[in-house]
């Protein structure tokens, strides 16, 4: 079957939730038995978000094949079973750099390179490539209609719709329908102007998703349909909800999936949302709660740890618990002391880069170890736990990471200079390597030690988890730390790189070099997070 396309755009304001809406629609279509993928097209000039500040852009989501991508791809994977790859996210920077590379190589035979057709052709080519083999491809365009940056992307999608045929394409536009308290009514004019903006570049939306803090009244939906040239049944009301996992059912209740299947002439089963109903039941009926302290350096923007936040919620679903996350700036631990860590049921230190706040994280790991507080360290969270143990248990005073102190006597964490990737190829890095795209990225095998807590949680000898880091445990100094009692319970496929450490004689202290949050989903959870939240609950009862 030829691929059908749903192009998702946004209007009026940003941050309306295009990614959540696209993922929710994909979840319904998948529940109807269709093979669905989702792509995100980002108009910014960065080649990828890998070197962007988390406080500006939010987290960098790492795919199975090692792409550093937009956090929306995390939403996609949490809503559907399809695994995202490098083909599912590209930026204007990536498009332009590829076109310029081809021009330098002589691929265009001396032609004058222009936005149309060369940039738009490259965009179309990547969309078609990413959609190949799927029944439905949902393509989300970042930004807001009217932005200069997004014009080449919208023009490319307009052309693609003409080329593949309008019977195989749907334009779905998210727009804001604000409620004005003084008038006591919702206002449709911003939506009308947003559609007018789309029409000015040759795109007639087929579906309007109207975001508001309440359901849009039928008379206002009819008004929007009339003035925006859209069937009334294709004007969908998407109100604010307490949980994003309610949205698939909300869209289905208004017949959005029926409209799309009829438009594409797809003969498929009714959507079975029983898995999502179970998720919502677990979420609405907790049997208790826990408070997890997340100690990091980007705590002013929770989206910087989006996948970790969601993974903790998923672990709450697994354990029928409400997980309350208390964000703690690691610099506050340095200045205010460890008292701010009291009354926490569990402590989590997520990944991060740079020296700022590191000593606060080391203090936090020490507090968790010495006070028997369940601890989960991720990436840098494992490295600070290793440094802390080396300093205070192994007696290696001044132990540190060469990332933070290149002249320290005991660089227990050091730059990876050579390792094997998933295909068995040797990757080499040095201090002179570029920051962008030079880390150990993507899914890597990890071999677990039998009898360890990690082995017990995973129930497997070999696991596969995603990585994003440059620094590793220094194998030259590692034996001294292990001799002091620290357990290395997970190793890379070649048995050279430390993947998991555990502190013995502690209720629950596990730290991993990889990022387990990237593979956690609301329907399946993740064994590490589930075990951590369970341990936190048991600690709360003491």
Swiss-Prot record:
EC code: 6.3.4.2
One CC-aspect GO term: cytosol
Protein family: Belongs to the CTP synthase family.
Gene: pyrG
Protein name: CTP synthase
Summary of activators and inhibitors of this protein: Allosterically activated by GTP, when glutamine is the substrate; GTP has no effect on the reaction when ammonia is the substrate. The allosteric effector GTP functions by stabilizing the protein conformation that binds the tetrahedral intermediate(s) formed during glutamine hydrolysis. Inhibited by the product CTP, via allosteric rather than competitive inhibition.
Top EC category: ligase
Subunit: Homotetramer.
Annotated residues for binding of ATP: 15-20, 72, 239-241
């Amino acid at each position: 079957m030829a691929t059908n396309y749903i192009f998702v755009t946004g209007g009026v304001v940003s941050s309306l939730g295009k990614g959540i809406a696209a993922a929710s629609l994909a979840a319904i279509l998948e529940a109807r038995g269709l093979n669905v993928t989702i792509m995100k097209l980002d108009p910014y000039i960065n080649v990828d978000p890998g070197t962007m500040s988390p406080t500006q852009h939010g987290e960098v989501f790492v795919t199975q094949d090692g792409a550093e991508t937009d956090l929306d791809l995390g939403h996609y994977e949490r809503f559907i079973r399809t695994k995202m790859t490098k083909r599912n996210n590209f930026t204007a920077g990536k498009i332009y750099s590829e076109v310029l590379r081809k021009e330098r190589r002589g691929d265009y035979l001396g032609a004058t390179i222009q936005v149309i057709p060369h940039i738009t052709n490259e965009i179309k080519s990547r969309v078609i490539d990413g959609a190949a083999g799927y029944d439905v491809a949902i393509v989300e365009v970042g930004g807001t209609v009217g932005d200069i940056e997004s014009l080449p992307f919208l023009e490319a999608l307009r052309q693609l719709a003409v080329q593949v045929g309008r019977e195989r394409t749907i334009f779905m536009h998210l727009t804001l329908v604000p409620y004005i308290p003084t008038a006591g009514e919702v206002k449709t004019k911003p939506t009308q102007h947003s559609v007018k903006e789309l029409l000015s570049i040759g795109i007639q939306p087929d579906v309007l998703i109207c975001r508001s803090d309440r359901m849009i009244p039928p008379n206002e939906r009819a008004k929007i349909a009339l003035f925006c040239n859209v069937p009334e049944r294709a004007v969908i009301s998407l109100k604010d909800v307490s949980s994003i996992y309610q949205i698939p059912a909300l869209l289905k209740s208004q017949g959005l999936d029926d409209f799309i299947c009829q438009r594409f002439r797809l003969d498929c089963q009714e959507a079975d949302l029983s898995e999502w109903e179970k998720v919502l039941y677990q979420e609405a009926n907790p049997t208790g709660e826990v408070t997890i302290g997340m100690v990091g350096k980007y705590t002013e923007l929770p989206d910087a740890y989006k996948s970790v936040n969601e993974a903790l919620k998923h672990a709450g679903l697994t354990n029928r618990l409400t997980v309350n996350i208390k964000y703690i700036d690691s610099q506050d631990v340095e200045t205010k002391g460890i008292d701010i860590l009291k009354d926490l049921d569990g402590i989590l230190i997520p990944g991060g880069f740079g020296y700022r706040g590191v000593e606060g994280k080391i203090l936090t790991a020490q507090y968790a170890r010495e006070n028997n507080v369940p601890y989960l360290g991720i990436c840098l969270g494992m490295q600070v736990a290793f440094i802390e143990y080396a300093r205070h248990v192994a007696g290696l005073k001044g132990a540190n990471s060469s990332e933070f102190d290149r002249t320290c006597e005991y660089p227990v964490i050091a730059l990876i200079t050579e390792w094997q990737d998933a295909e068995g190829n040797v990757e080499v890095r040095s201090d002179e390597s570029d920051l962008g795209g030079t880390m150990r990225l993507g899914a890597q095998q990890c071999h677990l030690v039998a009898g360890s807590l990690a082995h017990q949680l995973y129930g497997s000898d070999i696991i596969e988890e995603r990585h994003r880091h440059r620094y590793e445990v220094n194998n030259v100094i590692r034996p001294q730390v292990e001799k002091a009692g620290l357990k290395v319970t997970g190793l890379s496929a070649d048995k050279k790189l430390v993947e998991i450490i555990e502190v013995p004689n502690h209720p629950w202290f596990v730290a991993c070099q990889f990022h387990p949050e990237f593979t956690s989903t609301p329907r399946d959870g993740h064994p590490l997070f589930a075990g951590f939240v369970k341990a936190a609950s048991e600690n709360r009862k003491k």
